[in-house]
Amino acid sequence: MTITLCGGGNLGHVLAGYLSSQPGTTVSLLTSRPSAWSSSLEVSDSQGRIYRGSLQQISANPADVIPTAQIVLLCLPGYAFQSVMEAIAPYLSPSTWVGSVVSSTGFFFQAGCHLPPGQPLFGFQRVPFISRIAEYGHRAELKGYKDSLSVAVLPPTSESSESGAAMLSHFLSLFHVPVRRLDSIYQASLSNSNPLLHTSRLYTLWHNWQPSITYPDCPMFYSDWTLEASHLYLAMDDELQHLARILGLPPGSIPTVLDYYESTDAESLTAKLRSIQGFRGIPSPMRQTDAGWQPDLQSRYFHEDFPCGLRYPWQLARQHSLATPNIDKVYHWGMKMINSTQ
Protein backbone atom coordinates (compact mmCIF):
# COMPACT_ATOMS: atom_id res chain seq x y z
CA MET A 1 0.00 0.00 0.00
CA THR A 2 1.33 3.44 -0.90
CA ILE A 3 0.42 6.29 1.44
CA THR A 4 1.26 9.98 1.21
CA LEU A 5 0.94 12.15 4.29
CA CYS A 6 0.46 15.89 3.88
CA GLY A 7 1.71 17.97 6.80
CA GLY A 8 4.47 17.68 9.35
CA GLY A 9 2.95 18.66 12.68
CA ASN A 10 2.59 16.51 15.79
CA LEU A 11 0.18 14.04 14.17
CA GLY A 12 2.13 14.05 10.91
CA HIS A 13 5.29 13.00 12.74
CA VAL A 14 3.68 10.17 14.67
CA LEU A 15 1.70 8.87 11.69
CA ALA A 16 4.76 9.02 9.42
CA GLY A 17 6.80 6.90 11.82
CA TYR A 18 3.98 4.59 12.86
CA LEU A 19 2.55 3.86 9.39
CA SER A 20 5.95 3.44 7.72
CA SER A 21 6.83 0.84 10.38
CA GLN A 22 3.86 -1.34 9.38
CA PRO A 23 4.58 -4.28 7.05
CA GLY A 24 3.60 -3.79 3.43
CA THR A 25 3.32 0.00 3.56
CA THR A 26 5.27 2.61 1.62
CA VAL A 27 4.95 6.11 3.03
CA SER A 28 5.93 9.44 1.47
CA LEU A 29 5.56 12.94 2.86
CA LEU A 30 4.44 16.26 1.39
CA THR A 31 5.83 19.04 3.58
CA SER A 32 6.89 22.65 3.24
CA ARG A 33 10.13 21.77 5.08
CA PRO A 34 11.56 18.71 3.31
CA SER A 35 15.18 19.50 4.20
CA ALA A 36 14.34 19.33 7.93
CA TRP A 37 13.24 15.69 7.71
CA SER A 38 15.24 12.49 7.97
CA SER A 39 14.08 9.53 5.92
CA SER A 40 14.40 7.41 9.10
CA LEU A 41 11.89 8.10 11.87
CA GLU A 42 11.43 6.86 15.42
CA VAL A 43 8.20 7.00 17.41
CA SER A 44 8.11 5.94 21.07
CA ASP A 45 5.06 5.41 23.26
CA SER A 46 4.53 5.56 27.02
CA GLN A 47 4.70 1.76 27.32
CA GLY A 48 8.23 1.66 25.93
CA ARG A 49 7.29 0.48 22.44
CA ILE A 50 9.33 1.98 19.62
CA TYR A 51 8.18 2.19 16.01
CA ARG A 52 10.97 2.67 13.48
CA GLY A 53 10.08 3.51 9.91
CA SER A 54 11.53 4.93 6.73
CA LEU A 55 9.97 7.40 4.33
CA GLN A 56 10.29 6.62 0.64
CA GLN A 57 10.18 10.24 -0.51
CA ILE A 58 10.01 13.65 1.18
CA SER A 59 9.09 16.61 -0.98
CA ALA A 60 7.45 20.01 -1.13
CA ASN A 61 6.25 19.25 -4.67
CA PRO A 62 2.92 17.39 -4.97
CA ALA A 63 4.00 16.03 -8.37
CA ASP A 64 6.66 13.95 -6.59
CA VAL A 65 4.47 12.21 -4.02
CA ILE A 66 0.78 12.37 -4.99
CA PRO A 67 0.39 10.55 -8.36
CA THR A 68 1.43 7.12 -7.03
CA ALA A 69 -0.48 7.32 -3.74
CA GLN A 70 -3.40 5.00 -3.06
CA ILE A 71 -4.18 6.87 0.17
CA VAL A 72 -3.53 10.58 0.78
CA LEU A 73 -3.94 11.56 4.43
CA LEU A 74 -4.05 15.22 5.41
CA CYS A 75 -2.47 15.99 8.79
CA LEU A 76 -3.18 19.70 8.62
CA PRO A 77 -4.84 22.53 10.50
CA GLY A 78 -8.15 23.55 8.99
CA TYR A 79 -6.80 26.84 7.67
CA ALA A 80 -4.34 24.93 5.44
CA PHE A 81 -6.93 22.69 3.75
CA GLN A 82 -7.73 24.94 0.81
CA SER A 83 -4.16 25.62 -0.32
CA VAL A 84 -3.05 22.00 0.01
CA MET A 85 -6.18 20.59 -1.64
CA GLU A 86 -5.75 22.94 -4.58
CA ALA A 87 -2.07 21.94 -4.86
CA ILE A 88 -2.68 18.17 -4.86
CA ALA A 89 -5.89 18.11 -6.92
CA PRO A 90 -4.22 17.99 -10.38
CA TYR A 91 -2.20 14.90 -9.39
CA LEU A 92 -4.92 12.76 -7.83
CA SER A 93 -6.15 9.57 -9.44
CA PRO A 94 -9.96 9.23 -9.43
CA SER A 95 -9.52 6.10 -7.28
CA THR A 96 -7.24 7.68 -4.67
CA TRP A 97 -8.79 7.99 -1.22
CA VAL A 98 -8.18 11.41 0.32
CA GLY A 99 -8.68 11.55 4.07
CA SER A 100 -8.12 13.80 7.02
CA VAL A 101 -6.91 12.82 10.44
CA VAL A 102 -9.04 15.70 11.76
CA SER A 103 -12.48 16.16 10.19
CA SER A 104 -14.04 18.70 12.54
CA THR A 105 -12.16 21.63 11.00
CA GLY A 106 -14.14 21.65 7.76
CA PHE A 107 -12.51 18.78 5.84
CA PHE A 108 -15.59 17.48 4.03
CA PHE A 109 -16.95 20.97 3.37
CA GLN A 110 -13.60 22.18 1.96
CA ALA A 111 -13.03 19.01 -0.07
CA GLY A 112 -16.34 19.53 -1.84
CA CYS A 113 -15.05 22.90 -3.04
CA HIS A 114 -11.38 22.22 -3.79
CA LEU A 115 -11.00 18.55 -4.84
CA PRO A 116 -12.25 16.91 -8.06
CA PRO A 117 -15.96 15.96 -8.05
CA GLY A 118 -16.50 12.40 -6.89
CA GLN A 119 -13.08 12.07 -5.24
CA PRO A 120 -13.35 9.30 -2.59
CA LEU A 121 -13.09 10.87 0.87
CA PHE A 122 -12.75 9.66 4.44
CA GLY A 123 -12.31 11.44 7.74
CA PHE A 124 -11.68 10.42 11.33
CA GLN A 125 -14.19 11.51 13.95
CA ARG A 126 -11.38 11.86 16.49
CA VAL A 127 -7.63 11.70 16.05
CA PRO A 128 -6.20 8.18 16.37
CA PHE A 129 -3.30 9.22 18.59
CA ILE A 130 -2.25 11.89 21.07
CA SER A 131 1.00 13.04 19.50
CA ARG A 132 4.00 15.22 20.28
CA ILE A 133 7.13 16.06 18.31
CA ALA A 134 10.33 15.19 20.20
CA GLU A 135 12.84 16.26 17.53
CA TYR A 136 11.45 17.81 14.37
CA GLY A 137 11.76 15.52 11.37
CA HIS A 138 13.39 12.73 13.38
CA ARG A 139 11.57 11.61 16.53
CA ALA A 140 8.08 11.83 18.02
CA GLU A 141 6.14 10.61 21.03
CA LEU A 142 2.88 8.67 20.79
CA LYS A 143 1.37 9.75 24.09
CA GLY A 144 -2.00 8.00 23.85
CA TYR A 145 -3.92 5.46 21.76
CA LYS A 146 -7.66 5.25 21.13
CA ASP A 147 -9.49 1.99 21.90
CA SER A 148 -11.50 2.32 18.69
CA LEU A 149 -11.84 4.63 15.71
CA SER A 150 -14.87 6.05 13.92
CA VAL A 151 -14.60 7.11 10.29
CA ALA A 152 -16.94 8.89 7.88
CA VAL A 153 -16.74 7.95 4.21
CA LEU A 154 -17.97 9.77 1.09
CA PRO A 155 -19.33 8.20 -0.99
CA PRO A 156 -20.45 5.45 1.41
CA THR A 157 -18.49 2.26 0.82
CA SER A 158 -21.68 0.60 -0.42
CA GLU A 159 -21.50 3.02 -3.36
CA SER A 160 -17.74 2.64 -3.84
CA SER A 161 -16.03 0.08 -6.02
CA GLU A 162 -15.24 -3.22 -4.33
CA SER A 163 -11.51 -2.63 -4.76
CA GLY A 164 -11.80 0.91 -3.37
CA ALA A 165 -13.67 -0.24 -0.29
CA ALA A 166 -11.11 -2.99 0.27
CA MET A 167 -8.25 -0.51 -0.03
CA LEU A 168 -9.73 1.78 2.61
CA SER A 169 -10.45 -1.17 4.91
CA HIS A 170 -6.86 -2.35 4.59
CA PHE A 171 -5.55 1.10 5.45
CA LEU A 172 -7.76 1.38 8.53
CA SER A 173 -6.64 -2.07 9.68
CA LEU A 174 -3.13 -0.67 10.12
CA PHE A 175 -4.29 1.01 13.35
CA HIS A 176 -5.04 -2.39 14.96
CA VAL A 177 -8.21 -1.29 16.75
CA PRO A 178 -11.91 -1.73 15.91
CA VAL A 179 -13.12 0.76 13.29
CA ARG A 180 -16.75 1.88 13.04
CA ARG A 181 -18.16 3.38 9.85
CA LEU A 182 -20.26 6.45 10.59
CA ASP A 183 -23.68 6.98 9.01
CA SER A 184 -23.07 10.58 7.96
CA ILE A 185 -20.21 12.99 7.37
CA TYR A 186 -21.87 15.25 9.96
CA GLN A 187 -20.90 12.74 12.65
CA ALA A 188 -17.24 13.46 11.91
CA SER A 189 -17.64 17.09 10.91
CA LEU A 190 -19.59 18.18 14.00
CA SER A 191 -17.30 17.37 16.88
CA ASN A 192 -17.54 18.13 20.57
CA SER A 193 -13.81 17.51 20.79
CA ASN A 194 -11.45 20.43 20.04
CA PRO A 195 -14.01 22.86 18.53
CA LEU A 196 -15.94 22.82 21.82
CA LEU A 197 -13.31 21.54 24.26
CA HIS A 198 -10.69 24.15 23.42
CA THR A 199 -13.02 27.07 22.85
CA SER A 200 -14.94 26.64 26.10
CA ARG A 201 -11.67 26.62 28.02
CA LEU A 202 -10.30 29.66 26.18
CA TYR A 203 -13.50 31.61 26.81
CA THR A 204 -13.52 30.91 30.54
CA LEU A 205 -9.84 31.77 30.79
CA TRP A 206 -9.94 35.11 29.01
CA HIS A 207 -13.42 36.36 28.14
CA ASN A 208 -12.75 39.47 30.27
CA TRP A 209 -9.23 39.99 28.95
CA GLN A 210 -8.07 43.36 27.61
CA PRO A 211 -4.67 44.15 26.05
CA SER A 212 -3.67 46.03 29.22
CA ILE A 213 -4.12 42.90 31.37
CA THR A 214 -1.22 40.54 32.14
CA TYR A 215 -1.10 37.43 34.33
CA PRO A 216 1.62 36.26 36.73
CA ASP A 217 1.83 32.75 35.28
CA CYS A 218 0.65 30.44 32.51
CA PRO A 219 -1.84 27.80 33.73
CA MET A 220 -1.86 24.27 32.36
CA PHE A 221 -4.62 23.91 29.79
CA TYR A 222 -5.99 20.62 31.13
CA SER A 223 -4.30 19.98 34.48
CA ASP A 224 -5.74 23.29 35.75
CA TRP A 225 -9.14 22.80 34.06
CA THR A 226 -11.94 24.56 35.95
CA LEU A 227 -15.50 23.75 36.91
CA GLU A 228 -16.62 26.88 35.05
CA ALA A 229 -15.08 25.54 31.83
CA SER A 230 -16.85 22.20 32.33
CA HIS A 231 -20.23 23.86 32.77
CA LEU A 232 -19.76 25.86 29.57
CA TYR A 233 -18.41 22.83 27.68
CA LEU A 234 -21.49 20.80 28.65
CA ALA A 235 -23.87 23.63 27.71
CA MET A 236 -22.26 23.88 24.28
CA ASP A 237 -22.46 20.12 23.89
CA ASP A 238 -26.19 20.20 24.66
CA GLU A 239 -26.62 22.66 21.80
CA LEU A 240 -24.52 20.51 19.46
CA GLN A 241 -26.62 17.44 20.32
CA HIS A 242 -29.78 19.41 19.51
CA LEU A 243 -28.27 20.39 16.15
CA ALA A 244 -27.44 16.74 15.46
CA ARG A 245 -31.08 15.82 16.02
CA ILE A 246 -32.22 18.61 13.71
CA LEU A 247 -29.88 17.22 11.03
CA GLY A 248 -31.45 13.79 11.41
CA LEU A 249 -28.50 11.99 12.98
CA PRO A 250 -29.34 8.87 15.00
CA PRO A 251 -29.34 9.32 18.81
CA GLY A 252 -25.88 8.76 20.21
CA SER A 253 -24.16 9.12 16.83
CA ILE A 254 -22.07 11.92 18.31
CA PRO A 255 -21.25 10.67 21.82
CA THR A 256 -22.04 13.23 24.48
CA VAL A 257 -19.13 14.77 26.36
CA LEU A 258 -20.20 12.98 29.54
CA ASP A 259 -20.38 9.62 27.79
CA TYR A 260 -17.08 10.07 25.98
CA TYR A 261 -15.20 11.07 29.14
CA GLU A 262 -17.06 8.54 31.32
CA SER A 263 -18.35 11.29 33.58
CA THR A 264 -21.70 12.05 35.19
CA ASP A 265 -21.64 15.82 35.77
CA ALA A 266 -19.47 18.92 35.56
CA GLU A 267 -17.55 18.03 38.71
CA SER A 268 -16.56 14.55 37.54
CA LEU A 269 -15.77 15.88 34.06
CA THR A 270 -13.41 18.44 35.60
CA ALA A 271 -11.62 15.73 37.55
CA LYS A 272 -11.40 13.54 34.45
CA LEU A 273 -9.89 16.21 32.21
CA ARG A 274 -7.38 17.15 34.87
CA SER A 275 -6.24 13.53 35.21
CA ILE A 276 -5.77 12.36 31.60
CA GLN A 277 -2.14 11.30 31.29
CA GLY A 278 -1.80 12.30 27.64
CA PHE A 279 -2.96 15.85 28.43
CA ARG A 280 -0.46 16.50 31.21
CA GLY A 281 2.14 19.18 30.67
CA ILE A 282 0.18 21.01 27.96
CA PRO A 283 0.25 24.74 28.75
CA SER A 284 -2.41 27.27 27.88
CA PRO A 285 -1.65 29.21 24.69
CA MET A 286 0.09 32.26 26.14
CA ARG A 287 3.11 34.41 25.42
CA GLN A 288 5.41 35.95 27.99
CA THR A 289 5.99 39.70 27.95
CA ASP A 290 8.13 41.92 30.15
CA ALA A 291 5.04 42.66 32.24
CA GLY A 292 3.76 39.08 32.52
CA TRP A 293 1.74 36.54 30.54
CA GLN A 294 -0.92 37.27 27.92
CA PRO A 295 -3.07 35.09 25.61
CA ASP A 296 -1.29 34.14 22.39
CA LEU A 297 -3.91 35.16 19.85
CA GLN A 298 -1.72 33.79 17.03
CA SER A 299 -1.86 30.24 18.37
CA ARG A 300 -3.65 27.41 16.58
CA TYR A 301 -6.10 27.24 19.48
CA PHE A 302 -7.50 30.52 18.18
CA HIS A 303 -6.81 30.37 14.44
CA GLU A 304 -8.03 26.80 14.00
CA ASP A 305 -10.66 26.10 16.64
CA PHE A 306 -12.83 29.17 16.03
CA PRO A 307 -12.84 29.91 12.25
CA CYS A 308 -12.20 26.30 11.18
CA GLY A 309 -13.90 24.39 14.00
CA LEU A 310 -16.68 26.07 15.96
CA ARG A 311 -17.64 27.94 12.79
CA TYR A 312 -19.37 24.90 11.27
CA PRO A 313 -21.87 24.05 14.03
CA TRP A 314 -22.49 27.78 14.44
CA GLN A 315 -23.17 28.11 10.68
CA LEU A 316 -25.40 25.04 10.47
CA ALA A 317 -27.40 26.19 13.48
CA ARG A 318 -28.02 29.53 11.74
CA GLN A 319 -29.10 27.76 8.54
CA HIS A 320 -31.63 25.70 10.50
CA SER A 321 -32.86 28.59 12.70
CA LEU A 322 -31.67 26.81 15.84
CA ALA A 323 -30.90 28.91 18.92
CA THR A 324 -27.43 28.17 20.30
CA PRO A 325 -26.70 30.97 22.79
CA ASN A 326 -23.60 29.38 24.32
CA ILE A 327 -22.00 28.46 21.01
CA ASP A 328 -22.88 31.94 19.73
CA LYS A 329 -21.24 33.86 22.56
CA VAL A 330 -18.07 31.75 22.49
CA TYR A 331 -17.77 31.89 18.69
CA HIS A 332 -18.33 35.64 18.49
CA TRP A 333 -15.86 36.27 21.33
CA GLY A 334 -13.19 34.11 19.70
CA MET A 335 -13.59 35.77 16.30
CA LYS A 336 -13.44 39.19 17.94
CA MET A 337 -10.17 38.21 19.63
CA ILE A 338 -8.70 36.98 16.34
CA ASN A 339 -9.84 40.04 14.40
CA SER A 340 -8.33 42.36 17.00
CA THR A 341 -4.87 41.24 15.86
CA GLN A 342 -5.45 41.99 12.17
Language-model segment annotations:
Residues G48-Q57, P117-P120:
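A short helix-to-beta-strand connector/capping loop
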Residues T31-R33, P62, V102, Q125, ...:
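Residues at the C-termini of beta-strands that transition into short coil/loop
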Residues S54-T68:
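Short acidic low-complexity segments
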Residues M1-I50:
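NAD(P)+-binding Rossmann beta1-loop-alpha1 motif at the extreme N-terminus of oxidoreductases
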Residues I71-L74, G78-A140:
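Rossmann-like NAD(P)(H) cofactor-binding subdomain of soluble oxidoreductases
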